[in-house]
Swiss-Prot record:
This is ATP-dependent Clp protease ATP-binding subunit ClpX. GO terms for molecular function: ATP binding; ATP hydrolysis activity; ATP-dependent protein folding chaperone; protein dimerization activity; unfolded protein binding; zinc ion binding. One of its GO terms (biological process) is cell division. Keywords: ATP-binding, Chaperone, Metal-binding, Nucleotide-binding, Zinc. Zn(2+) binds at C9, C12, C31, C34. The gene is clpX. CDD domains: RecA-like_ClpX. PANTHER family: ATP-DEPENDENT CLP PROTEASE ATP-BINDING SUBUNIT CLPX-LIKE, MITOCHONDRIAL (PTHR48102:SF7), ATP-DEPENDENT CLP PROTEASE ATP-BINDING SUBUNIT CLPX-LIKE, MITOCHONDRIAL-RELATED (PTHR48102). HAMAP family: ClpX. ATP-dependent specificity component of the Clp protease. It directs the protease to specific substrates. Can perform chaperone functions in the absence of ClpP. SUPFAM superfamilies: Glucocorticoid receptor-like (DNA-binding domain), P-loop containing nucleoside triphosphate hydrolases. SMART domains: AAA, ClpB_D2-small, zf-C4_ClpX.
Amino acid sequence: MTKEKELHCSFCGKEQKEVDKLIAGTSGYICNECIELCHDMLANADDIEEIDEEFQEEEPKLPTPHEIRAHLDDYVIGQDYAKKVLAVAVYNHYKRLRSEKNTSEVELGKSNILLIGPTGSGKTLLAQTLARMLNVPFAMADATTLTEAGYVGEDVENVLQKLLQNCDYDIEKAQQGIIYIDEIDKITRKSENPSITRDVSGEGVQQALLKLVEGTVASIPPQGGRKHPQQEMLRVDTSKILFICGGAFAGLDKIIEKRTNTSGKGIGFGADVRIDEEKVSLTELFKQVEPDDLMKFGLIPEFIGRLPVIAPLSELDEEALVKILTEPKNALTKQYQVLFSLENIELEFTQEALIAMAKKALARKTGARGLRSIVETLLLDTMYDLPSIENLQKVIVEEETVTENKVPVLKFNS
């Protein structure tokens, strides 16, 4: 047998006589048929990559301001002006992110948002609803727990850590996210004049937040670890993250009144003031807020400059609280009705009971936030006994249940 007859393709095993060509390599042979097959496979792979790239380029349609506002209406009662401001700001923010993929000589700046409104007016809910609608990661932090790096308390960069955790440490997703910082009015500096002493929980936190809010590349330890020199860090670009800050800003109304020479009666949110001989709500007054007013309140100028969009929220009245109990898609009464239906029991709230609950929340000055506590207290004993009561068909919460702590009316199957 000659050496030529022993030669064969190292891939398909065919002998030299069975193929047109056999090409020698350093440690084997490949036939023309295997070369053609490999060429076809690589060509198909290129086609698949092109299809993948085209598919990735097709982003979901960005909802318009009208669509954003309509979605907020499904979950948040009232606050029409704030919804409009938020809808436009959020639309422009994500439009800016998409425009960065296209070459443009004009660089679009980021517009973070400041929500001003009393406790329980819906600031947090608005931010959460926006993130859920846009399907982007969301993280929330309480400004009062934050301190400068190196001091006892929560480092401001921990906020980014929360955002990363909420998207399984996908940096690209995190950089499209929304961060809500509550109680921002509680980190004001103690006086208008700079102090020689270090204010690590007031002005110091504002300074620490400044870089994150305006945009920086932050180094975050992976999977919630602590920073150390040898560790490989995750780098997050915060210039693409939308920051929404919220606070009650109690007393800001007086600063605006003083500047505008306004005289009014009543104090706090919801009071009426007189401007140009006309009575308007404090919400209208807060629409006139200027950077100087916020500086006098205690925010530093640099921080104010990073929150150019201001959305005032009004205090919720009795009618709004009743609507909050019943109208949103995830209204409180609907949630408890679902809980009771899991036991095959119907739950009903009379209109008088709803009004009484709204009045109780107003008296507590807790806004919508206090409604869950009220409903939970009213139904505690009933929910405790529920699984043990036989033949129960319906539970009715009446006005007396709220005002006189009476047990809800129970109706049984006959």
